[in-house]
Amino acid sequence: MITEERILKVLRAPHISEKATMAAEKANTIVFKVAKDATKKEIKAAVEKLFEVEVKSVNTLVLKGKTKRQGMREGRRSDVKKAYVTLKEGQDLDFVGGAE
C-alpha cells in the first residue's frame, strides 16, 4: 500500500509541450514530470487518487539534463523523469477548467 504522503510527492507538475498537447488530443494521454525514484505503480495510484480518473497504462522515461556553458563555466541541468499516462476510454482530465 502506498502512503498518502508518498502519493503527494510522486507527481511534480504537468509537462506542457507541443508533443504533450498532441498526445492529449489524439491518444487521451497526459504527460507529467515525476519524482526520479517513482515507479509506474506509484504514478498510476497517484493519478487515480488525485484526479479521480481510471488509468489504462503508464510509460516512463528519464530525460538527461543538458550541458550548458556561461563563459568559461560549464554546468549541467538536472535529469527529469517524465510519465506518459494513458487514460481509459471516456475518462477526461482538464487542468485549465475553463467556462463551458
UniProtKB/Swiss-Prot annotation:
One Pfam family in the UniProt entry: Ribosomal_L23
Keywords: Ribonucleoprotein, Ribosomal protein, RNA-binding, rRNA-binding
Entry's Gene Ontology cellular component terms: ribonucleoprotein complex; ribosome
InterPro entries documented for this protein: Nucleotide-bd_a/b_plait_sf, Ribosomal_uL23-like, Ribosomal_uL23/eL15/eS24_sf, Ribosomal_uL23_CS
Name of the gene this protein is made from: rplW
Organism (species): Vibrio atlanticus (strain LGP32) (Vibrio splendidus (strain Mel32))
Disulfide bonds: none
Function noted in UniProt: One of the early assembly proteins it binds 23S rRNA. One of the proteins that surrounds the polypeptide exit tunnel on the outside of the ribosome. Forms the main docking site for trigger factor binding to the ribosome.
Entry's Gene Ontology molecular function annotations: rRNA binding; structural constituent of ribosome
The protein, known as: Large ribosomal subunit protein uL23
PROSITE patterns: RIBOSOMAL_L23
GO terms, biological process: translation
